[in-house]
Amino acid sequence: MKIKTHNFFNIGVLTLFGTFFTIPLYSFISAIIITSPANRIIDIYGHEKNGLGMPVRTYRTHSPVRALFWGFIPALLLFAAVYYIKKGYEPILPTPYFILLQGLLSGELHLLLDLPTNGGIFINKKRFALGHFAYNNPLINFAAVAAGLFLISISFTGGNYAKDYNNIKYIFWNFRRQV
């Protein structure tokens, strides 16, 4: 996938994930700050040229365990900055631990979008691909960008219902009574 596609999709998923812990604006800002460098690191550091001069993915960044690490680096830096700033403004800023979780997810979401492409990802040092689409396939890239924008819109329009246990209990209780 293209780097823009990775960024839109990751920002959408991480924003929605972060709304379970804080307000959508904080989640959106932290998702932008984490996603852009994490995807850059994974794509730039994780490609090298083969014997024909074609860029190919490497095991260095496109494996599930190592992607956790590469996504966690920008999150750790942001967490340290927010934690340091938060000391003076305790009641205003939320606890920034969700930023670390967003960082862990960021690398794995990058791999999720690379899975249906020709290059695939590496599992146990062997290449694995679910589909064989070109990385610049406009339909696949558009679908991922649209999904990311949809998730961002859900998170800003009240998609954080999981915070309230009573809403979940009410939904499942009514579903069970109807069946």
What role is predicted for each listed range?
Residues 1-179:
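N-terminal membrane-targeting hydrophobic helices
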